[in-house]
Design a protein with these regions (language model features):
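A feature for the membrane-embedded catalytic helix bundles of lipid/isoprenoid biosynthetic enzymes
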Residues: 1-29, 88-211
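Membrane-embedded alpha-helical segments that form the functional core of polytopic membrane enzymes
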Residues: 22-85, 98-115, 179-190
Length: 211
């Protein structure tokens, strides 16, 4: 390898690390959008059942990068209005696409619920002084508090999040029997908590002094 190539490679690596430290969440968000676009492309061009597994894999990586995105934002303290809004749009778009292509009858009502709750959470995050999870932990019922306890690092939250991915994945892969229905309770939990979150934050916003 020539010296010129080494210098060029070092500069590209330096730029990448600078960008990662400067805008980590934005870079991860861009990768997530690329994965979603690839999944949509494979879905509409798929000619065999095996390619459906690639769609699930690409969207699964998208979900995992969402966890990395949150970690990087907390780790480097890079939170901004743009970053919050971008993360919200990527999350909701990914969920909507995956649930719609799953063919499940519950896809449309669940996505409408998610978008409504997401918009309220986004507005609350951008405008309110306290974090929206603090409201839920302070005023929510026992189930809501348990779901959001320990920053959602608990069994209930894991069940809801995993089921939210596994149920549409199972349906999309044309699985049946227990491999499909085992995830229904987790999705029901996810939907109930989302509904309660929507109602509670909407009421909190209405009764806030700024309103």
């Amino acid at each position: 390898m020539s010296k010129l190539h080494r210098v060029g490679g070092e500069r590209r690596a330096s730029f990448f690390y600078w960008a990662l430290l400067r805008y980590p969440s934005t870079l991860v968000g861009g990768i997530r959008l690329g994965l979603l676009a690839a999944a949509i492309g494979v879905h509409f061009s798929e000619t065999s059942d095996e390619l459906r597994w690639w769609v699930v894999l690409l969207i699964g990586l998208n979900y995992l990068l969402d966890l990395l995105d949150g970690y990087l934002a907390r780790r480097f303290g890079h939170t901004s209005r743009f970053g919050v809004a971008l993360d919200f749009l990527i999350d909701q778009t990914t969920h909507t696409v995956f649930w719609l292509i799953s063919g499940l009858l519950a896809a449309i009502p669940l996505m409408v619920l998610e978008w409504c709750a997401g918009i309220v959470v986004l507005r609350y995050t951008l405008c309110a002084d306290e974090h929206w999870k603090e409201v839920l932990l302070a005023k929510g019922g026992a189930l809501v508090r348990a779901y959001f306890a320990h920053n959602q690092r608990n069994v209930l939250s894991a069940l809801g999040v995993i089921s939210h991915f596994a149920l549409p994945a199972s349906s999309y892969l044309w699985l049946s029997g227990w491999s499909l229905w085992i995830w229904v309770p987790g999705v029901a939990l996810y939907a109930w908590v989302t509904l309660r979150m929507l109602v509670m934050l909407y009421r909190a916003e209405i009764h806030s002094p700024a309103s």
